[in-house]
Curated annotation (Swiss-Prot):
Gene name in the database record: Fsn
Organism of provenance: Drosophila willistoni
One Pfam family hit: F-box-like
Biological classification of the source: Eukaryota, Metazoa, Ecdysozoa, Arthropoda, Hexapoda
PANTHER family hit by this protein: F-BOX_SPRY DOMAIN-CONTAINING PROTEIN 1 (PTHR12245:SF7), SPRY DOMAIN CONTAINING SOCS BOX PROTEIN (PTHR12245)
Protein name: F-box/SPRY domain-containing protein 1
Function: Required in the presynaptic motoneuron to down-regulate the levels of wnd and restrain synaptic terminal growth at the neuromuscular junction (NMJ).
Length: 255
């Protein structure tokens, strides 16, 4: 019979040790044995709380931005999937919260940003929240690493080439390879996007499709036949001082 005091002691020791390991090591530890896997599977444990509080910016933890990711582990995961400060237009910077981009007021420029991590396998979902004016063009979607992140003028940059796919929220049009692929969503008098609404983007790399949800309503498949390439969450914007946040959610829930 296991001594409960000894078991608690082992639990506390593991907690301390795991708090000092990096995330890659924690992933490997979860595969060592059933006990460690069970221990680390608690997404609100003190281990994940410690890593979350030490790695996430305080601005993010204090805001309402992460309400869709309820556990410490999912908040931490969302942070590592957020906008990349090294993969965006020179006219864009990532705010201290780590999740929100800010487009500087530069005339005659369209500017884009990509997430830190792209996907080639599996199913993935993330939320995009446009927190400032849309301007004449505001596009959300995906791109490969080869898609441009800045161009002259006010245009739909995301979707302007064969390396990107986007939904222009201003005109409710789908864009790819420089062409309008049709209206979206396929509804009569589809409502326009309202600033602050959360749009859920769903990338299915197994089925090669991109879809969107708004207000928990599935809007339909937007793009089919996506290539077998690593695809990144991306947005492009034209309005000066507008801001766009992105929160990675993980595997989408069906139904």
């Amino acid at each position: 019979m296991v001594d409960p005091v000894a078991a608690l002691c082992n639990f506390n020791v593991l907690e301390v040790i795991f708090s000092y390991l990096d995330l890659n090591d924690l992933s490997r530890c979860s595969q060592v044995c059933r006990s460690w896997h069970h221990f680390l599977n608690d997404e609100n444990s003190d281990v994940w709380r410690w890593h979350c509080l030490h790695k996430l910016p305080k601005e993010a933890m204090k805001s309402d931005l992460l309400t869709s990711v309820s556990t410490y582990k999912t908040k931490l995961r969302a942070y590592f999937h957020a906008w990349s400060p090294n993969d965006c237009s020179r006219n864009v910077y990532i705010k201290p919260n780590g999740f929100t981009l800010h487009r500087n007021p530069v005339a005659q420029s369209t500017d884009a940003a990509r997430a830190k991590i792209g996907f080639r396998h599996g199913r993935h979902a993330w939320e995009v929240i446009w927190e400032g004016p849309l301007g004449t063009v505001a596009v959300i979607g995906i791109s490969t690493k080869d898609a441009a992140l800045q161009c002259h003028g006010y245009v739909a940059l995301l979707g302007s080439d064969d390396q990107s796919w986007g939904w222009n929220l201003v005109e409710n049009h789908l864009l790819h390879n420089g062409d309008m692929q049709g209206s979206y969503p396929l509804l009569s008098n589809a409502p326009k996007y309202q600033v602050g609404e959360r749009i859920r983007v769903i990338l299915d790399c197994d089925d090669n499709t991109l879809s969107f949800e708004k207000n928990y309503e599935f809007l339909g498949v937007a793009f089919r036949g996506l290539p077998d390439k690593k695809l990144y969450p991306t947005v492009s914007a034209v309005y000066g001082n507008t801001e766009v946040s992105m929160v990675y959610l993980g595997t989408p829930l069906d139904g």
